[in-house]
Swiss-Prot record:
Keyword Amino-acid biosynthesis: no
UniProt keyword annotations, A-Z: Host membrane, Membrane, Transmembrane, Transmembrane helix
Coiled coil, from the record: none
A cellular-component GO term for this protein: host cell membrane
Main location: host cell
Protein name per the record: Protein MGF 360-1L
Chain segments annotated as transmembrane: 4-24, 75-95, 109-129
Source organism (scientific name): African swine fever virus (isolate Tick/South Africa/Pretoriuskop Pr4/1996) (ASFV)
Function in brief: Plays a role in virus cell tropism, and may be required for efficient virus replication in macrophages.
Bridged cysteine pairs (disulfide): none
Amino acid sequence: MKAFLGFLLLSYLAIILVHDNVNCIIFGIFDPCFYKISSKISNDYSSMQCSHPISYIGYEMFIQKWKDDNYWPLIIRHCCFYLVFSIAFASCVAFAIRRNLHLSTTMKLLGLLSILVWLAQPVLNQPFPT
C-alpha cells in the first residue's frame, strides 16, 4: 500500500510538472503580452495584461516561460490533497468490506467521492495571493 501511494504521488507530481498551466510572455505583432496558457486544452488562453489580445496558434509567436515562477506551493497543495483523497478512498473501500456492503452501494460511495474531487479542482488550481 505504501509503495502504491508513493507511486501515485510521484506520478501525479510528474503530471503536474508537464501538464499544468504555464505563465508566458508572448512576443507577437504588438508589444509583449502576458498570457496564462493551458497545455491541457488546445488554444485555451486567458489574457492577463494584454493591450491587443490575440490567439496563439502553432508557432506564430515566441513563447518564453517566466523565470520567477514558483510551482512548489501548488505542487505541495496538489500532493497533500491527493494524499488525503487516497486515504479517503482506501477508507471507503475498507468501510465497505467491513460492513459487507453491496457492490452498488460501494460504487455509489466511490462515485460521490470522485465527484467531490472533481469539484475541488478549480479551488486547487487557484494561484496563491502575492
